[in-house]
Design a protein with these regions (language model features):
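N-terminal hydrophobic targeting/anchoring segments and the immediately downstream early-domain regions
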Residues: 8-191, 244, 252-382
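Loop-centered beta-sheet repeat module
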Residues: 194-229
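A composition/secondary-structure signal for short, hydrophobic, low-basic-content segments
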Residues: 1, 52-54, 236
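N-terminal secretory signal peptides
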Residues: 1-9
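Short hydrophobic/aromatic-enriched beta-strand-loop microsegments
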Residues: 235-241
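N-terminal secretory/targeting leader peptides
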Residues: 204-208, 250, 255-256
Length: 382
């Protein structure tokens, strides 16, 4: 469109959109945006106007003291490219087998220290409540919500949750792939051993509600989820999953991911309790398939209970010891799909519009639904 007019580069335009907002960018160079075929003006405006949040994004950092804080990562640049306003910045402690008491706690503290320094390098602050999220969005400043995937670091010590809270933790994934030293509940990919939520897991949920930490029940089996919902006094999130009817085109991936998907019945239970469920990018080979997976979940539990939770990485993988990680298609947020030409949230908004979502609906799924439960959870302590 209007290709004879002077234009900015795509990077210059996307930066302007993120920093100044769509309206300001157009005022600075009103024709430049539409000279870039990849960015539709309606998409750009929605991205600028909404608080786009990925509720489960892995940022790999070192967990051993000799490697803290790791190589510089361009988190700010990746976030601006993506169009996201915020991410729930998470990491896991059990990728390398935990073998002794205290090891998970040490990894957790090293991970937080690494993240402290990486955030400082990037000029990014943690959002501790909804007011922080809204202020960062108003200032066009990327922000993060500190998360952890799995309560392995607790090791039976309730007081460690308070320590984590004071270090900025506001989103706790109760479980991950392996059982913690002091278990919190049954993991959906492991044989059930504990009858659902354990007594210590119940204590942790109560303490999260008291302190003001959002509880994430991803990786929990049905019995654990049911017990947690009966106990919780604030809404919860299942940050990354997909409806078990949406299996995609890759049969191998479908078989592997099937235990990690949520049934219609369980999704309704979470929604009826006021919770939200994040749809991941797995099992979606194209942005349109991803938007269709979002639509499938919306059709089951309603527009007010669905959010985005990619289970991807904005920044490169970190391999302990300096090893090489080749990565794979779909691993990085801004490269979620083959031949993706624009940042993640721009791509998703475009696909959602093409799938029939309204601007208001995109705003809810993009971030408003998460903001509602995050606000309710962090109201435990201001």
């Amino acid at each position: 469109m209007m290709k004879t007019q002077p234009t900015w580069s795509r990077r210059e335009f996307l930066t302007a959109i993120t920093v100044a907002g769509a309206g300001t960018a157009m005022m600075m160079n009103p024709l430049a945006a539409w000279a870039i075929d990849e960015v539709d003006p309606r998409v750009a405006k929605i991205v600028a106007d909404t608080i786009g949040i990925d509720t489960h994004n892995h940022i790999d950092v070192p967990l051993t003291p000799t490697e803290v804080p790791g190589p510089n990562i361009d988190l700010a640049g990746e976030m601006k490219q993506s169009g996201l306003s915020a991410i729930c910045m998470t990491f896991a402690l059990d990728y390398q087998k935990l073998q002794k008491t205290g090891e998970a706690y040490e990894r957790f503290m090293n991970g937080l220290t690494s993240m402290d320094q990486q955030l400082e390098r990037n000029g990014i602050k943690r959002s501790l409540n909804l007011a922080d999220l809204q202020a960062a969005h108003k200032q066009r400043q990327p922000t993060v919500i500190q998360s952890i995937e799995g309560g392995h670091f607790l090791e039976g010590h309730l007081d460690r949750l308070g320590e984590a809270y004071h270090r900025g933790l506001r989103h706790l994934g109760l479980l991950h792939d392996s059982d913690a030293l002091v278990p919190l509940g049954d993991v959906y990919t492991n044989p059930a051993r504990f009858g659902g939520l354990t007594a210590f897991g119940a204590d942790i949920i109560k303490e999260c509600n008291r302190l003001g930490i959002l509880v994430d029940l991803a990786h929990a089996n049905a019995d654990t989820v049911a017990a947690a919902l009966k106990l919780a006094t604030h809404p919860v999130i299942i940050s990354h999953t997909g409806l078990d009817t949406q299996l995609g085109q890759n049969q191998f991936m479908a078989r592997m991911m099937r235990p990690r998907l949520i049934s219609k019945e369980q999704a309704k239970i979470v929604a009826d309790a006021g919770g939200v469920i994040g749809v991941w990018t797995h099992l979606a080979d194209t942005p349109l398939e991803y938007a269709q997976n979002i639509r499938a979940l919306v059709d089951v539990i309603g527009i007010d209970h669905v959010c985005i939770g990619t289970d991807t990485k904005l920044t490169p993988s970190f391999t302990p010891g300096g090893g090489q990680n080749r990565g794979r298609v779909g691993e990085r947020t801004n490269e979620a799909w083959q031949d993706q030409k624009i940042g993640f949230y721009f791509t998703v908004v475009d696909a959602m519009l093409k799938t029939g979502f309204t601007e208001e609906e995109i705003g809810k799924i993009g971030g408003d639904n998460f903001c509602r439960v995050f606000d309710a959870a962090t109201a435990g302590r201001r």
